Structure formats: structure tokens, C-alpha cells
């Protein structure tokens, strides 16, 4: 199932987690946070915000209806956010409201060819790589790296079957029947910190940490593009 064609259609409705910064979550966000074992507000404030400056240029993969996008834009008041998605997200994200600070790219593959080289300080995704097999993930990391500045940071949530085993499949809302099926037939393909780290290294990134420890069910990796660190 985690083929590019499947991903293009499965989330075409635009995934929406609500306002990730509100102190009181919506019902949808509450259910997601219960499944993942984390607070989205804490994920943003501790996992992403420390890497954002007012003038940062950020690349976001798979924004959906913009839950994380709006949080990012609230921090990069003099910077830019470029989003990449298989669907046209402009109706949901409304880039015209941001005076050129938000650029939405609709793409057909994982080449990142629509984006300029050596342009971004931060590469972010949440709820995206968990639905990609490790081969797709490595392709994404390889091709996106050319768009990043030297020393740029990447932060990505991804599925971690080792943590999922400890957390509980039912609690994590992932069908335990997936254990017996190949990755091609499931929407939560096999991954863990070792596989993810290997894919990132193969793609040319340096690993800051394979997991920042903010999620109970999944992991969040922090990578650095070789060069002078940007903090």
C-alpha cells in the first residue's frame, strides 16, 4: 500500500490535526495524541521551535490542511515556508494571506526538482514518513538534501515498530494483523531507529539523534546536513 500512487490518493482529502498549539486540544487532536502518546504542543515547542528563527526558510513535506504549517508560520515571521504535497493544498493553507511567506508546491514524485538548491534551514514532516516504506524514505532524504543549506536541520516523525511493540498496537491504533503482512500490503510499513538511521546516513545526512523522545509510539529523528551547524 505505501506506494507513491497510493499516497497520492489516500490523503487527498487533506489530513487535519487542528490547532497544534492550543493548550486545550480539539477532539480530533486529543484522539491522535492519545494514540501517539504525546502532546502536539510539546512536540512543536520542544522538538521544532528551538530550530526556528524569525527569518528561517523551512521546507515542510506533506502539510495536509496545514496544522503544523500555521504553527511554523507563527514563528518564522520574517522567513518563508515552502510546502510539498501530492495534492494542491492552496485552498486549505491560503498562501495569499501570508504576503509571499508561504509557497505551496504540488508535486508528482519525490524528486524535489521544483525546489531551489541550497535554500532551506529546516526540513520538517509529521505523519508522513510513517506511511512510507524505507526505500521511499531514503529517496526523499537523498533528493531533499540538495535543497538544504549546509548545516541545515531535518526533523521527521516516523514509525518505529520497536516502540510500537512496547507501547501497544491497539493503544497505538495500528492493526496488529500488520505483523503478518508484507509492507506492500499495509499503511504502517516496518521501520525502527536502526533502519531510519541507516537510510539517513546513506542519504548523506549526519545524525544528531535517532529519537528525541517526545513520542511514546513513534520516533522523531533529527538530522544535520554536513557543514556548519545552524542553531
Pin down the residues of each PLM region.
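Class I (Rossmann-like) S-adenosyl-L-methionine-dependent methyltransferase catalytic domain
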Residues: 1-55, 61-114, 132-136, 155-231
Amino acid at each position: 500500500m505505501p506506494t507513491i500512487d497510493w499516497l497520492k490518493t489516500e490523503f487527498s482529502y487533506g489530513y487535519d490535526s487542528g490547532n497544534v498549539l492550543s493548550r486545550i486540544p480539539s477532539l480530533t487532536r486529543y484522539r491522535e495524541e492519545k494514540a501517539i502518546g504525546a502532546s502536539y504542543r510539546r512536540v512543536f515547542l520542544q522538538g521544532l521551535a528551538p530550530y526556528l528563527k524569525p527569518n528561517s526558510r523551512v521546507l515542510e513535506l506533506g502539510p495536509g490542511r496545514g496544522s503544523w504549517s500555521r504553527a511554523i508560520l507563527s514563528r518564522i515571521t520574517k522567513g518563508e515556508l515552502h510546502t510539498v504535497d501530492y495534492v494542491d493544498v492552496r485552498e486549505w493553507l491560503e498562501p495569499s494571506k501570508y504576503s509571499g511567506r508561504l509557497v505551496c508546491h504540488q508535486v508528482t514524485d519525490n524528486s524535489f526538482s521544483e525546489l531551489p538548491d541550497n535554500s532551506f534551514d529546516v526540513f520538517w514532516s509529521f505523519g508522513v514518513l510513517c506511511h512510507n516504506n524505507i526505500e521511499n524514505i531514503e529517496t526523499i532524504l537523498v533528493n531533499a538534501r540538495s535543497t538544504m543549506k549546509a548545516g541545515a536541520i531535518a526533523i521527521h516523525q516516523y514509525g518505529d515498530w520497536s516502540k510500537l511493540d512496547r507501547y501497544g498496537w491497539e493503544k497505538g491504533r495500528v492493526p496488529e494483523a500488520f505483523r503478518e503482512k508484507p509492507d506492500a500490503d499495509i499503511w504502517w510499513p516496518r521501520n525502527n531507529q536502526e533502519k531510519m538511521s541507516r537510510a539517513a546516513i546513506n542519504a548523506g545526512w549526519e545524525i544528531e539523534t535517532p529519537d528525541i523522545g517526545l513520542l511514546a509510539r513513534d520516533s522523531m529523528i533529527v538530522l544535520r546536513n554536513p557543514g556548519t551547524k545552524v542553531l
